Amino acid sequence: MAEDAPVVQQTMLEPEVLLKKRKVNERTRKERVEQAIAKKEAQKKNRKETFKRAETFINNYRQRERERIRLNRSAKNKGDIFVPDETKLLFVIRIAGVKNMPPKIRKVLRLLRLSRINNAVFVRNNKAVAQMLRIVEPYVMYGIPNLHSVRELIYKRGFGKINGQRIALSDNALIEEALGKYDVISIEDIIHEIYNVGSHFKEVTKFLWPFTLTPVKHSLMEKKVKHFNEGRKAGYCGEEINELIKKQV
């Protein structure tokens, strides 16, 4: 009889073990439900914030454009020429250079992240960048992108660098995870930061993978720059860069 006691005790313990396990499972399930609800609420809040920001950005862009048009008209009426503030944003496209490049040229192109022909990047227009562009001028075209070009490039050709991989900017959650600490939580925030050369321009451009553009015919490039670049096929092209972007996006 004494030998049967452990069996009886084990039988009595089984319901208690199952009950504890059931309670743990219920608690875990409840926590998951609560987490899912909290995540859904956070996503809803972020969507509202994203829409609100986008609306604010668009209103600001429109206001700036109206002011630019007003100043331009006012200058024309007075017989003057309206000269806008020095541009802060440039878009650089690599158009040449494969073999027999001097080491210095190759190094600067690498610093600009233009490792291949038809790679392109946004850069801040400052003294250091201007010096680099002068060095590689025979191998690049660069100019002033407008808001439409910035939007088209980021929406259609934009990829982010996440864990060393090239990831499409198709989910704001990925953007928030990578750039949320800079208060950049959506693709519209990226556009705003780039176009306005904001305080976190460096972090955002570093996050963006260099753009890969569609090749265009050599004659088109020559035509685009000939009249303002003395027949050269490379270099600064001002706002004409937007026509080239339109062909290559």
Swiss-Prot record:
GO terms for molecular function: RNA binding; structural constituent of ribosome. It comes from the Eukaryota. The keyword Transcription regulation does not apply. Disulfide bonds: none annotated. One of its GO terms (cellular component) is preribosome, large subunit precursor. Signal peptide: none annotated. It is found in: Cytoplasm; Nucleus, Nucleolus. Keywords: Cytoplasm, Nucleus, Ribonucleoprotein, Ribosomal protein. GO terms for biological process: assembly of large subunit precursor of preribosome; maturation of LSU-rRNA from tricistronic rRNA transcript (SSU-rRNA, 5.8S rRNA, LSU-rRNA). The keyword Metal-binding does not apply. InterPro entries: Ribo_uL30_ferredoxin-like_sf (IPR036919), Ribosomal_uL30 (IPR039699), Ribosomal_uL30_CS (IPR018038), Ribosomal_uL30_euk (IPR005998), Ribosomal_uL30_euk_arc (IPR035808), Ribosomal_uL30_ferredoxin-like (IPR016082), Ribosomal_uL30_N_euk (IPR012988). Its main location: cytoplasm. Component of the small ribosomal subunit (SSU). Mature yeast ribosomes consist of a small (40S) and a large (60S) subunit. The 40S small subunit contains 1 molecule of ribosomal RNA (18S rRNA) and at least 33 different proteins. The large 60S subunit contains 3 rRNA molecules (25S, 5.8S and 5S rRNA) and at least 46 different proteins. There are 3 genes for uL30 in S.pombe. Belongs to the universal ribosomal protein uL30 family. Component of the ribosome, a large ribonucleoprotein complex responsible for the synthesis of proteins in the cell. The small ribosomal subunit (SSU) binds messenger RNAs (mRNAs) and translates the encoded message by selecting cognate aminoacyl-transfer RNA (tRNA) molecules. The large subunit (LSU) contains the ribosomal catalytic site termed the peptidyl transferase center (PTC), which catalyzes the formation of peptide bonds, thereby polymerizing the amino acids delivered by tRNAs into a polypeptide chain. This is Large ribosomal subunit protein uL30A. It comes from Schizosaccharomyces pombe (strain 972 / ATCC 24843).
